[in-house]
Structure formats: C-alpha cells, structure tokens
Amino acid sequence: NLKKIFSVKIFIVYAFVSLLYLFPAFKNMEIFGFYDTAFHINRALSLESIFSSPINFETFRSYGMQVNNFYPWLTLYPLFLLIKFTNLAIGYNLFLYIVTLITLFICHYVMYEITKKHVTSSFFAIIYTTSSFRSVEIFLRGAMGELLAMSILPLILLGFIKLYDSKKESWVMLAISMTLLIYTHVLSVAMTMVMIIIALIIQFYRKKKIEIFLIIKLIKAAIVTLLLSLAFIGPMIEQTLYQDLNRPYVDILQKRAIYLGKEFLIGSIDSELLSFGIGL
C-alpha cells in the first residue's frame, strides 16, 4: 500500500521542499528560535544518561532537573543521537530536516487515504508542513515538543476517521498515534482528547443516536494506548504523588487571551509570522 502511495518522484519533491523550507537554517548552519530552543537542546543533551537515570547533572546548569520524568522524551531521542555523532548545529538542523520530511510523508499518506488523490495529498502536505504555525515553532519559538506533535496529529485524524471503517482492527491506528503523542507532548494529548469528545458530540447530534460499535472501538483504543504509555505515565504519576511541585510563577491565561475580531482575521491572511491567526 505504501509503495502505491509513495514514488521516487514524490520523495525527491518532498526532499527538495524540506531543504528549501529550511534553507535559512542550513545556509549558515544557524540554530533558530529564541524562546524554548535552549530548553529543548538541554533536554536532548540530558538524554545521554536516560537509560540509567532520568536526571542528568551535566545539563540545565547542573540543577538536576526532573524534566525527563514530566516531559516525554522518546521522539526527541534521535536529536540527541544526531548531536552526539555530528555537532550541535548540524545535528539540530538535520533533525529539523528529517522531521519536516517525515511530516510531509505523513500528511501525504493521511490525505491519500482519505481522498485517493495524489495532487490533493501533495497540496495538503506542503501547506500543512510549511504553515505559519509550524514555521513559528521552528524559526521563532524553537518549541520542539509542539513541532513533533504536529507531525503526529494528522495520523490521529486518520485514526479517528478509520473508526468508522467496518474492519475490526480499524481502531489500531488511533491507539498507536495517540501513544506516539503521549511520548511526545502531554498538552497536545489533552487538547486532542477534547477535540475527539467534541467531534463525538457533534456526531451524536447529527445522527441522534449512540453508535455502540464506535464506543467499543474507542474503548479498545483507549485501553491499548494506556497500556503502551505506562512507561511514561507510570513514573510521571509516581513522581507527582511523591513530592510537591512548586511553581515560581503562575500565569493568568485569561488576561493573555486573543480577541477573535478584526485583528485576528487580518492576522490570518497576512504574511507576518508574529501575527495571531488560524495558523496557516
């Protein structure tokens, strides 16, 4: 099935698109991002001791932070390997290139499974992968967790759609993709669960009935996801219950909310990355 979807031509096109998209970083081999970049690089470097201890005293100014117990690291581990076998700049930008290329392939696969059209799939893949929100994550915020989560979200969409498939194992993709998301970015998991619940409510109001087969598949997916994610969820819960977490600052998000008016609409269609919009 994958051979039918992907050809050498598609691979070459997406390899070129990824290189063109990340050309500003590769041109002078710079590390972009001004907000979370240092945090995520330190997170990646701290994985050198992850299989012996989640706490690394060589990073984060030797504070011995518990970050790896509370922030999933599995999908970030390749970044550590790339940095280890090259150097910081090459490893970081090469990781961005690989993630961008994989995102293009995932988006193409997801849309092709839905539409069976290569042109539509290519348009979706390129628009999603080069969207302003994803560009902000790379070139401004350096939010590696959210960036990796964005690569997985299309698979979750497809997994949810496949729940309506008559095949008994159609829930497997949702379980696997949700597990990957849990091992990548916890906040995205919470947001995704909210969106799934909203979609189910809308579907219920449309059909005016509860579809038992759908509920059964969701329960199966949830159980398998939970079991596959215990390696992260277990230690996180254990550490949360074991000790109090003190936060130096608690923000009031309501004060920073964006008004969905003229400014938001204009920001959605202009070419300024720093403006607030729908993320395209």
Model-derived segments and spans:
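Membrane-embedded transmembrane-helix bundle of lipid-linked glycan/lipid transferases
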Residues: 1-280
